[in-house]
A protein has these predicted regions:
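Acyl-group handling in specialized metabolite and lipid biosynthesis
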Residues: 66-71, 111-114, 234, 278-280, ...
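Membrane-proximal extracellular/periplasmic loop immediately following the first transmembrane helix
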Residues: 42, 47-100, 225-232, 247, ...
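N-terminal membrane-entry
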Residues: 278-295, 380-384
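Alpha-helical transmembrane segments of integral membrane proteins
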Residues: 1-21, 273-278, 306-333, 337, ...
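Mid-to-C-terminal secondary-structure elements
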Residues: 101, 115-139, 143, 147-286, ...
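Hydrophobic transmembrane alpha-helices
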Residues: 31, 290-300, 391-395, 441, ...
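Short, strongly hydrophobic transmembrane alpha-helices
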Residues: 17-45, 298-300, 344-348, 429-453
Length: 645
């Protein structure tokens, strides 16, 4: 009964000061909502384990290389076999290929299918379950012409085949027949397989790794230069992650000595799978957490100041009610009820704000969160919100209530006709203002530094013109385009078609690769240096482009000549190299006319041009902007750049 009476009294009191009530509610809602949103994101990314069994002991296996020792690079299939033979720290190691795509050719129009090529134990390492059929077995990973098999994801199966029973059915990818042996459970997500994918893309199907060479030609049982694999390893029980990482690194050291022409300068790096998937979010999240805490403190100070000012206005009212017989406990209960009511409304608004913010962030493709990370309102978020509300109640309800109810009545009545506040309230208000300004100043400085960093990121000089530029990706992983001359003719026809579109200034086809093989990174040795000496091996990224591509992209050609139509796959290999590449190959010398030999190749490459540095297909954090560019050898994955007027 007293509670209902206190609630009615609080509603009447707050109704007389709607501006005060709205301001307090909005301030609290924003403070609590912002903090709960940030901590919910941190919980989903940092605190919560990946949705895989024993995920804390799953390690991502990759290779580090000069200029990027922290790992993330690929290794070859022969290196994978060496890892299996020398492994002492993992009870299971699986390999998988970089993200790729094939075309489902059973319908009237081809359908893109995102593929992960994996070894047989890959899916079981991730705890995958099937809703129908089975997972891969060892005998499924065949390098011969045996009948190929495939496992479909639940989402892809529902999207393309509805509720049809697919087990045992034959589908065609790139006109190659595959027998469906399994369909994964609806909840399974292959986050490692999505590492090299575009934002929002998920794996649609899994194919045994042995079939990759037949379908893509990108992997070989014997070529140590064909670095296109990553690995997953489960650390043995009783062994620390640090010990497993050190043991894996030692394998890389031994291979570097055993194969100096292909593996020298490379390291093996093992990190937790979680770090590889979401480690890039850790630093920004800690910055956000710090900023949100400051925001909450500022909100607390604002609300405390509002409550103190409100209490000063009500001193005479409280004094009169106390003189009429209202006890101190009753006044405290009423004041607490008012504050609890304000906090309750603010908590509801904060929960709505958090729900909306998490949904918006979850659907924001540029955030590029792994598919195993789910931003959603759950019991942990609600617990965080309740905890923040509890702290707020203690700060804004109890202390002001005690202050207001224990006021000296004679002082209150004596001061009621004079402007100003009591000395105690004045000192408290000044302290709150000082703390609020201090916190705001720190937050302002941090925001300024963040904006400065953001501005630096948005003004990075990529070395080519990015204004009025459209890009698209073509994937020619199809038997129809498995011959290089067919791909070359296709790109020639594509350029003619696109150049005829209104507004298109030019069309640039940019593809990775040495002739006949797709690769982003190539080790090469300058002429006159011994290739078996690791110190002579220079790493460079290599691309295949059409004649005129440099000028079309705004990359200055400093010396030498551009490519011509005669620089095709039948002509001697020539290259235009960047300034950084020239400095690495021949410090202080003119590179024109000089030659270099890519490791694992027979044909020398002659330098015919020197171009300015540019960042193409490279990580922004990499300091090495060297790019080797060679004609011919267009791989199945092409980037198309369309400058427009």
């Amino acid at each position: 009964m007293d509670t209902l009476q206190n609630l009615r009294q609080s509603l009447r009191t707050l109704g007389k000061a709607p501006g005060f009530a709205i301001l307090v509610v909005l301030t609290l809602a924003l403070g609590i909502g912002a903090n709960t949103t940030v901590f919910s994101i941190a919980q989903a990314i940092v605190m919560r384990s990946m949705n895989y069994p024993d995920s804390d002991r799953l390690m991502f296996l990759s290779r580090g290389y000069p200029g990027f020792p922290q790992g993330g690079g690929n290794f070859s299939y022969p290196a994978y076999r060496d890892i299996l033979q020398q492994n002492r720290s993992f009870d299971d190691i699986a390999a998988f290929q970089e993200f790729g795509a094939l075309a489902l050719t059973d319908g009237a129009e081809p359908v893109r299918v995102n593929i992960n090529y994996v070894t047989p134990t890959y899916l079981s390492l991730l705890g995958a379950q099937t809703s129908a059929g089975r997972l891969f077995r060892k005998q499924d990973d065949r390098w011969d012409d045996a009948d190929p098999v495939i496992i479909l994801s639940h989402g892809f199966c529902q999207r393309e085949f509805a509720n049809q029973n697919m087990i045992g059915r034959v589908i065609h990818l790139n006109q190659q027949a595959f027998t469906v042996i399994g369909i994964t459970a609806a909840s399974f997500r292959d986050a490692p397989g999505e590492i090299d994918s575009d934002a929002g893309e998920q794996i649609d199907a899994w194919i045994p790794l042995g079939l990759s060479n037949r379908l893509t030609g990108l992997i070989s049982m014997s070529n140590r230069n064909g670095a296109i694999l990553w690995g997953l390893g489960h650390v043995k029980p009783g062994l620390t992650l640090q010990a497993a990482s050190a043991d894996f690194a030692s394998i890389g050291q031994r291979l570097s000595k055993a194969f100096p022409t292909t593996d020298a300068g490379f390291t093996f790096v093992a990190t937790t799978l979680k770090t590889r998937l979401v480690g890039a979010f850790y630093k920004p999240l800690w910055l956000l957490i710090g900023a949100s805490v400051f925001v909450l403190f500022i909100c607390c100070a604002n609300v405390a100041n509002l409550l103190l000012a409100r209490m000063v206005e009500r001193e005479r009212e409280l004094a009169v009610r106390s003189a009429l017989g209202a006890g101190v406990n009753r006044l405290i209960r009423e004041l607490l009820t008012e504050n609890l009511l304000l906090l309750g409304i603010a908590g509801i608004l904060a929960a709505l704000l958090v729900t909306w913010a998490l949904k918006a962030l979850g659907s924001w493709s540029r955030l590029n969160l792994p598919s195993v990370v789910h931003l959603q309102v759950d019991r942990w978020m609600l617990a965080d919100c309740a905890f923040v509300c509890l702290i707020a109640i203690l700060l804004f309800g109890v202390a002001p209530a005690i202050t207001g109810a224990s006021v000296d009545l004679r002082d209150a009545i004596g001061q009621s006709g004079r402007p100003g506040v009591s000395g105690r309230h004045r000192r408290a208000s000044r302290a709150l203002i000082v703390s609020e300004v201090s916190l705001a100043l720190v937050l302002l400085v941090g925001t300024g530094l963040l904006l400065k960093s953001f501005r630096r990121m948005t003004t990075i000089d990529f070395g080519f013109n990015t204004d009025n530029l459209l890009t698209l990706r073509l994937d020619l992983n199809s038997n129809k385009y498995d011959q290089e001359d067919v791909r070359t003719q296709f790109t020639r026809n594509l350029r003619e078609t696109l150049n005829g579109l209104p507004g298109v200034v030019s069309t640039t086809i940019w593809g990775p690769g040495m002739p006949g093989r797709e690769t982003w990174v190539v080790n090469a040795v300058p002429e006159g240096k011994q290739p078996d000496d690791p110190r002579n091996v220079i790493m460079s990224t290599r691309h295949s482009v059409n004649p005129g591509a440099l000028s079309e992209m705004g990359i200055p050609l400093l010396r030498g000549r551009d490519f011509t139509a005669q620089d095709d796959a039948r002509a001697p290999l020539v290259a235009i190299i960047s300034q950084s590449t020239a400095q690495a190959f021949w410090p202080g010398e003119d590179p024109l006319g000089k030659r270099f030999l890519p490791i694992g190749k027979r044909d020398w490459v002659s330098v015919v041009g020197l171009a300015a540095d540019a960042r193409l297909r490279q990580r922004l954090e990499m300091s090495d902007a060297a790019i080797g560019i060679a004609p011919g050898g267009l791989g199945p994955q092409l980037d198309v750049y369309l400058p427009y007027a």
